[in-house]
Amino acid sequence: MTLPKVSVVTVCYNCDKLLQKTITNVLRQTYKNLEYIIIDGASTDSTAEVIETFRPRLTTVVSEPDRGIYDAMNKGVRLATGEWVIFMNAGDGFAADDVLQRVFAEERAADVIYGDVVKRGVIRKAEAPHNGHRMFFCHQSALTRTACLREYPFDIRHRMSADFKLFKQLFLAGKRFLQLDFPIADFDVTGVSNSLRSAGLKDNIRVISEVDSLKERLRLLPRLYFVYFMCRLRGR
């Protein structure tokens, strides 16, 4: 079996220590058919020095201003030459050195392959594919066909939930989701989406309002509005 090429994309901005952790983790992957793309938003800390340390082992490096994390992720997709893309952003990492080897130990008839995630040392199980008010997996634990990411680029109007919109669009378009029963990623819990929960919920409300049918909006939005207002009351 020919191993498909995987493009690992890391986007970063002024997070030199987290970036070093992620690059070190990615380069430990035992999978052979892999390229590594770094998209830096013109950092002003020592990110450039960190990248230079690893430069011989990096496939592509871009350092220029962007319009936010999802704009940077779209840049990574445009540069990817692999059949599959996985985003492993600064601070995140693969759950084990042989993750990609396990993912592609057999041929996968899917458009999105996803698994569990490790948060604070605890495995959080992904859910079966469904259309919901939030993502049913963590995007760092998902490999997506490059063609799908080019057909449905991240909508940079959404500052926090463009990934939610993308995967919802893929699900509603009938793309094939394959759930694997092991952890793919070790997720950094200090990110923006974890520190501003009410803002993330508000953006999810926008996504559902844009993408879902009236029937689905009536099913999904009441609960989401309730959780959103409770978070606002608690100052989260």
Residue ranges and their predicted role:
Residues 32, 40-49, 89, 93:
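A conserved acidic beta->alpha catalytic loop
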Residues 85:
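Short aromatic/hydrophobic "clamp" motif used to bind/position activated sugar donors
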Residues 125-203, 207:
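Conserved nucleotide-sugar donor-binding catalytic segment
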Residues 4-7, 35, 165:
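Cell-envelope/extracellular polymer assembly enzymes that use nucleotide-activated donors
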Residues 17-20, 45-53:
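Acidic helix N-cap motif at the loop->helix transition within catalytic regions
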